[in-house]
Amino acid sequence: VQWTAEEKQLITGLWGKVNVAECGGEALARLLIVYPWTQRFFASFGNLSSPTAVLGNPKVQAHGKKVLTSFGEAVKNLDSIKGTFAQLSELHCDKLHVDPENFRLLGDILVVVLAAHFGKDFTPDCQAAWQKLVRVVAHALARKYH
């Protein structure tokens, strides 16, 4: 995938302001609340019975941070995202059997979370760059499925 200098700047500039623990936890919690069928992959996380339970679940928060920390590797390696996520793609396909559509859903949720956190700083140009990034990451994670 080709990135313009402006796209790279918009992505890395915003990433530098992201609170990974807060945004990661919120993104995963929102995924589990908005798309409840995704909860089946997190049975070991305990109580996910209500939005309040999901939002307050420390395992959701911790894994959300882990997911977004990993996403940060895409930001650092914009020109080699497929390679960056090769092992994670294998893990999610072969061992965890995660539906690859869930990667797209989580990417869309992340864009919503960033918009909520950054308001006017999350301009349409910034959103377009991030939407492109989450699509590329979702595709890289789904690569092992093809």
Swiss-Prot record:
Residues 2-146 form the Globin domain. Keywords: Heme, Iron, Metal-binding, Oxygen transport, Transport. Heme b binds at residues 63, 92. GO terms for biological process: hydrogen peroxide catabolic process. One of its GO terms (molecular function) is oxygen binding. The keyword DNA damage does not apply. GO terms for cellular component: blood microparticle; haptoglobin-hemoglobin complex; hemoglobin complex. The keyword Amino-acid biosynthesis does not apply. Red blood cells. Coiled coil: none annotated. InterPro entries: Globin, Globin-like_sf, Globin/Proto, Hemoglobin_b, Hemoglobin_oxygen_transport. Heterotetramer of two alpha chains and two beta chains. Involved in oxygen transport from the lung to the various peripheral tissues. Belongs to the globin family. This is Hemoglobin subunit beta. The lineage of its organism: Eukaryota, Metazoa, Chordata, Craniata, Vertebrata. The gene is HBB.
